[in-house]
C-alpha cells in the first residue's frame, strides 16, 4: 500500500535507486496505490551514469508491496519491500531489464512488456 511520501526501490536498470511517491494517479481523492497502480514519483537517489537523474519526475508502476496482494483463491503474496518500475509519458518502461519477481496481476494489456522482462512471475 503506497501513499504520498512513500519511498520505493526501483526494480529496473534506469539508474535510479530510490524514488519518492509524490502522487497516486487515478482520481482526486485517491489515497493508496497497490500492485499494478500508476504513481507519480521523484528520483531521490541515482547512480552516476544512469539514464535518469536525481530530482526528475516520472510515472511509475508499483510491482511489489510489503502489504501484498490477495488472490481469488484466498492466498496472499507479500514482499520484503516496496518496488516500482519507471515509465515514460506513454506508460512504457524506460529500462530494458527488470530485477526481482513481479506478480501475475501486472498481466494486463498495459504492462505485458514488464511481465516479459521480469525474471520471475509469481
Swiss-Prot record:
One of its GO terms (cellular component) is cytosolic large ribosomal subunit. Keywords: Ribonucleoprotein, Ribosomal protein, RNA-binding, rRNA-binding. It comes from the Bacteria. The keyword Ribosomal protein applies. InterPro entries: Ribosomal_uL14, Ribosomal_uL14_bac-type, Ribosomal_uL14_CS, Ribosomal_uL14_sf. GO terms for molecular function: large ribosomal subunit rRNA binding; structural constituent of ribosome. SMART domains: Ribosomal_L14. The keyword Lyase does not apply. One of its GO terms (biological process) is translation. Part of the 50S ribosomal subunit. Forms a cluster with proteins L3 and L19. In the 70S ribosome, L14 and L19 interact and together make contacts with the 16S rRNA in bridges B5 and B8. Binds to 23S rRNA. Forms part of two intersubunit bridges in the 70S ribosome. NCBIfam families: rplN_bact. Belongs to the universal ribosomal protein uL14 family. This is Large ribosomal subunit protein uL14. It comes from Burkholderia cenocepacia (strain HI2424). The gene is rplN.
Amino acid at each position: 500500500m503506497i501513499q504520498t511520501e512513500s519511498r520505493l526501490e526501483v526494480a529496473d536498470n534506469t539508474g535510479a535507486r530510490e524514488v519518492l511517491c509524490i502522487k497516486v494517479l487515478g482520481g482526486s481523492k485517491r489515497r493508496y496505490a497497490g500492485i499494478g497502480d500508476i504513481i507519480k514519483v521523484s528520483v531521490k537517489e541515482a547512480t552516476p551514469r544512469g539514464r535518469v537523474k536525481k530530482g526528475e519526475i516520472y510515472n511509475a508502476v508499483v510491482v511489489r508491496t510489503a502489504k501484498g496482494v490477495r488472490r481469488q483463491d484466498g492466498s496472499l503474496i507479500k514482499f520484503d519491500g516496496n518496488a516500482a518500475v519507471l515509465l515514460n509519458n506513454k506508460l512504457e518502461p524506460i529500462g530494458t531489464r527488470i530485477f526481482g519477481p513481479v506478480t501475475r496481476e501486472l498481466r494486463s494489456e498495459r504492462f505485458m512488456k514488464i511481465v516479459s522482462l521480469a525474471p520471475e512471475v509469481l
